[in-house]
Amino acid sequence: MKSYEIALIGNPNVGKSTIFNALTGENVYIGNWPGVTVEKKEGEFEYNGEKFKVVDLPGVYSLTANSIDEIIARDYIINEKPDLVVNIVDATALERNLYLTLQLMEMGANLLLALNKMDLAKSLGIEIDVDKLEKILGVKVVPLSAAKKMGIEDLKKAISIAVKDKKTAEIKYPNFEPYIKKITSILQKDEDLKKYNLRYLAIKLLENDKYVEEIVKNSKVWNELKPVLDSIINELSKKYGEAELGIVEERYKVIDKIVKEVMKKTSGKLTTTEMLDDVLTDEKIGTLLIIPFLWMLFKFTFDVSKPFSAMIEYFFGFLSEVVKSSISNKFIASLLADGIISGVGAVLVFFPILAFLFFAISFLEDSGYMARIPFITDRIMNKFGLPGKAVISMVMGFGCNVPAIMATRTIEDEKDRILTILINPLLSCSARLPIYALFAGALFSKYQGVVILSMYALGVVLALITAFLFRKLIFKTSPSYLIVELPPYHIPHLNVVLKNTWERVYDFLRKAGTIIVFGVILVWVLSVYGPSGYLGEEVFENPQLIANSWVAVIGKTLAPLFSPMGWDWRACSALVFGIIAKEVVVGSLAMLYGTGEENLSSVIAHAFSPVSAYAFMAFSLIYLPCIATLAVIKQEIGWKWALFAVTYEMILAYVVALVISVIGNLLF
């Protein structure tokens, strides 16, 4: 079977992931790009007896290689030379999207344009002459609406034709053609350079691109080219200030001409998006509205998920009893029932909460509102010393700190990036939610949503204060500002929301099936063994026995340090195991208190006071990041900063928990 490799590329929020999923279905492979931890998604599909491998490149606005994502996209297209590059273009923002298109054409890529969101463009009064656009660019243009699955078959057909009918389209830049021609006439004298598109090399040399400059410096023609290039750049610098700015200006002149020829906007009235943004992005009103929006999100999550959690809780309690009564070998029965089933069950009981939370977040994302939160809060972030782009990473931190830290790669300034990474673990990821849900349900049942929301708010407040102090004491420079795309509002597409929800829930389940199982088994082993050897599986029913275990030794060693908070050795031990993954804390508590998930809430209600429980939640929010987060911090900014993060978070967690305990006990 003949096979081809194609790449999908486009600006962020153009529907690239939706098109990738529509093309590949479930045939998706997720890994990392070589040398970095940026996620690499690959998939495949078959059409007319041919196989197509699809590579989903990171979302980028340009290929100027100022960020890791841009470098990955550029290097892949230049070095891997895919059979076809499918450029996803947002029909509602044609002018902005065509900038990347022109850069791809400059590279000499075999190009196909997928003009997405045509239905939305039509509703906004935007008309695009697809045939004329195709003629001007010299590449095939396929109109579609991926969210409604319209045009996907047309896209597959166009791909199957374009991979065979390879051609390089070229856009002329009138004011720069003489310079480009002069440079390429020298470059073509070196046969080794002909593996690259010479026009692309010439344009990038005019832009002072260091990557291309290094390629040409090692060529046979560099000595001849250097004085010619310097002369041209000096001439352009006098005219434009910088030669690079001249190229950018020329691209936008071409884009402006194209847009005027192919696009008409028939509606002159205010759009729904413009009317909503007058209110929702207002500096004062918009900021105030964020709080009730987030409160409703949490209210929805817990009210709807409660009966589903109760059913899972009952199932795992029943399963644990069945295993104990069915397996004669008490060691194996205890490992399965008290270890794996009890521990994992205590975590999975929060699966509905996470599912509905992710659903609500995906709903807000697809509606277009979530993108406004960074925009609305940008000025506030700058007052606390954070760069504008940090807001995007912070919002992602509410899902998982690992991808949130990776997202800081779009921050160009190194000090800004390090600062953003250091404060990100203070933002409450979804893995901490089971801890909050357990304690809030056990001791604050009437105010469960408010208590949990307060944990998220506490994390944000601490992150902002920490950022302000670090900016003053360590990173003594001004933060950069945010440039972010605000997509139009629209009614969320259920299939897109469900797809995003499932991907996030699946990540949680995958983690629950690996790290959590390992964690609870480790806790079980340390519980049934002690300094004197094997204690027996009865430890979970006999508090006297488990008090002699290794896990008790660990907890009792730490207990005096945490006695002001009112926590016993079991609580201290659970926090230690939470370093593996925060989800492990709940499973550890279930085993250490010798109960299944069905009775854990009542046990917690007796073991903790409201004040000590709230302090425990706060400590869980702030203290050491999980192993995965610590590993990615080390990879991104090194061991020095990773150890710094561990140290300051432990100190901060202890101080905050102590303050809550002291003040709480004085007041209540």
From Swiss-Prot:
Protein name from the UniProt record: Fe(2+) transporter FeoB
Positions annotated to bind GTP 2: 35-39
Binding site for Mg(2+) 1: 21-22, 24
Consequence of changing residue 61 to F: No change in GTP hydrolysis rate
Residues reported in the UniProt entry to bind GTP 5: 145-147
Binding of GTP 4, residues: 116-119
Any one GO MF annotation of this record: ferrous iron transmembrane transporter activity
Keywords: Cell membrane, GTP-binding, Ion transport, Iron, Iron transport, Magnesium, Membrane, Metal-binding, Nucleotide-binding, Transmembrane, Transmembrane helix, Transport
Subcellular compartments: Cell membrane
Source organism: Methanocaldococcus jannaschii (strain ATCC 43067 / DSM 2661 / JAL-1 / JCM 10045 / NBRC 100440) (Methanococcus jannaschii)
NCBIfam families per UniProt: feoB, small_GTP
Role noted for this protein: Probable transporter of a GTP-driven Fe(2+) uptake system, might be able to transport Fe(2+) into or out of the cell.
Residues annotated as domain FeoB-type G: 3-165
Listed Pfam families: FeoB_C, FeoB_Cyto, FeoB_N, Gate
Binding residue positions for GTP 3: 56-59
